[in-house]
A protein has these predicted regions:
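Hydrophobic, proline/glycine-rich low-complexity stretches
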Residues: 1-91, 103
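Internal, well-folded beta-alpha domain core
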Residues: 108-200
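Membrane-lipid interaction segments
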Residues: 94-95, 107
Length: 200
């Protein structure tokens, strides 16, 4: 939603925690897993996080994609991450495209949903298949900040392991997130297991 009046311009500085887009990510490796989704659980997610207010106020309605009732889990390994911005930068420092590289790991779940428009015309012109991400985690803080500030993705910082499993050409992945082991008063924040995957 736009607010009347002048917008505050974004100013890049050498103290920024984000790196300006666009980005170049060569040689990304993806491990993808697909499993049947519980349609009722997907609808509940849509109602809790996407279908806010009344349908008339929103102008749309999210529902599960019943024709393809599956969920996806993806592990991504980015060996090189480079800013490929061609815009001139006047920050008094080396431009980001001329700096070194970084790497990261990323894990997210993906649910295919349908965004239905309102009314007969809306059903034809404003209906689209989209993907929602119930969670997305990354292993590097810069990617976490850029994902939130530049792309609007609620990325969380996590510890992510990716390696070959016990058998040749198998895969093993794990995610650990900050949290509390119990609701007891005084419980100290620690890094807890969140997700483990291993193929045979």
């Amino acid at each position: 939603m736009r607010v009347a009046g002048p917008a505050i311009p974004y100013v890049q500085s050498s103290a920024s925690q984000d790196v300006p887009p666009p980005y170049h990510f060569p040689d990304v490796t993806v491990q993808a897993f697909i499993w049947p989704a519980q349609i009722g659980a997907v609808q509940k997610y849509c109602d809790n996080f996407l279908n806010l207010g009344t349908r008339e106020e929103r102008g749309f309605e999210y529902r599960p994609l019943a024709a393809w009732p599956y969920a996806m889990l993806l592990f991504l390994d980015y060996p090189e991450m480079i800013s490929s911005s061609r815009e001139p930068e006047d920050i008094g420092e080396t431009p980001y495209p001329e700096r070194g590289i970084t790497s990261q790991r990323e894990v997210f779940a993906c649910l295919p949903v349908v965004r239905y428009g309102n009314g007969p015309l809306g059903l034809i012109a404003d209906t689209d298949i989209e993907c929602v991400l119930p969670f997305i985690v990354v292993s590097k803080p810069w990617s976490c900040v850029c994902g939130r500030e530049m792309l609007g993705l609620g990325k969380l910082l996590a510890e992510i392991d990716m390696a070959e499993g016990y058998y040749p050409d198998s895969f093993r992945g794990a995610v650990r997130l900050p949290g509390w082991a119990s609701d007891a008063p005084g419980e100290h924040l620690s890094v807890l297991p969140f997700l483990d995957v291993e193929t045979g």
